[in-house]
């Protein structure tokens, strides 16, 4: 168990947000609401709520980032989600969220984040989607397995972190060391929510077969968009990436 815990720690690269950064965000985005959520174990999670929807009942997109991602960067692209509320909450240990990340904690926190936002006045529970990028694809897939979703948008996803690591280090007993980490493929066959998967044509982190395995296993309606010329960490620099997100939101 100690080896497993130590190995899992290698997955996370928490990025913090200092007080000056927080003040800068509040000044730059005056319409953004700061959010504090208490996890089931008492850990405080911090994030942002962009109210982009209109009307008495608003659709909601809940975003989960990568393993080295402080999610406030997404505020600069909130207009992509025009017509939708956008929930950006940092993993524990990231941004201004307290605690230490682990698979068990992040999956449990995803449920708390969903329940918090869906419980807010004016949020339409029938029109909630989850968006997961890289590590966040595992969190988003788990959330979609536990809560009703209008749709699931996965960016540079994997079938299982353990399988990705085994591809990268075929000479090591990765499955023995890591155990079963973020096994989205095991959850995929039971999914009924529509999936849009966005992948990079030159992803140097997630082998193409790992994304394809998840796509093939998905039980609900699905479509796959490949961003030509993109790598794992520069998808956001391609106009086609943001257009693929907009198109999914408008369906």
Pin down the residues of each PLM region.
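Membrane-embedded segments
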Residues: 40-116
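Short beta-strand/loop motif that positions the catalytic acidic residue
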Residues: 190-192, 197-203
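Acidic catalytic loop of the alpha/beta-hydrolase fold
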Residues: 202-206, 232-233
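Alpha/beta-hydrolase fold nucleophile elbow
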Residues: 123-134
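Short alpha-helix in the alpha/beta-hydrolase fold that links the catalytic acid
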Residues: 77, 184, 193, 207-216
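An N-terminal hydrophobic leader/cap segment in hydrolases
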Residues: 1-36
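Active-site nucleophile loop of the alpha/beta-hydrolase fold
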Residues: 149, 153-163, 180-184, 230
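Catalytic histidine-centered segment of alpha/beta-hydrolase-like enzymes
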Residues: 230-240
